[in-house]
Amino acid sequence: RARVTKLERREKRFFIQTERGPIQAESILVGTSGYTGNAIKKLQKKVIPIGSFIIATERLSDELAYQLSPKNRMIFDSMHYLNYFRLWDNRMIFGGRAAFFPENKNTIGRSAEILRREMIRVYPQLKDVKIDYVWGGTLDFAFDMMTHVGEVDGMYYSLGYAGHGVAMASHLGKTVAEAMMKGNIKE
């Protein structure tokens, strides 16, 4: 992984400068999601980077874990900016959009507090449970809340997963790569 600092297209080749060195390619697929940077301004304007954060509790007793999720299933609510949660290793893993800013030291700490409140709203029996871990990442939302796949200036892209990238990015990555090989993709 290396951040792209400059991107140019000359004739039929792309010249890409990264923090780790230069790359040349005949075609490229941009799948940067919330990390789409200044080097690709036309795509950066298509999405809004938003933080997504997760907390993990201390290990819970078998009895409490069963009480919270008898079938140990992944759960999410139906809010527009949803929360999602499940048990793993007898820990409650609880995530959501606690802050609309990309992750940094301040947003991670504040997000842990917000997610803890949300977790206790859903599971009041966790009010005295300690939070062992918190982390975050940056995802992207398109202005129309839809995933966008297409080609701009000869670059193929897939962006705007709105928190569904784990499932959709794998599928669309394969689909776009196949379309690139055939040369037939339009937004």
Predicted segments with their positions:
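Active-site substrate-recognition segment that forms the wall
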Residues: 4, 14, 21-62, 66-153
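C-terminal lid/capping helical subdomain adjacent to the catalytic/cofactor pocket in oxidative enzymes
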Residues: 152-187
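Conserved ATP-binding module of the ATP-grasp superfamily
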Residues: 1
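Flavin (FAD/FMN) cofactor-binding and adjacent substrate-gating region
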Residues: 11
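Short beta-strand segments that buttress and anchor functional surface loops
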Residues: 16-18, 160-161
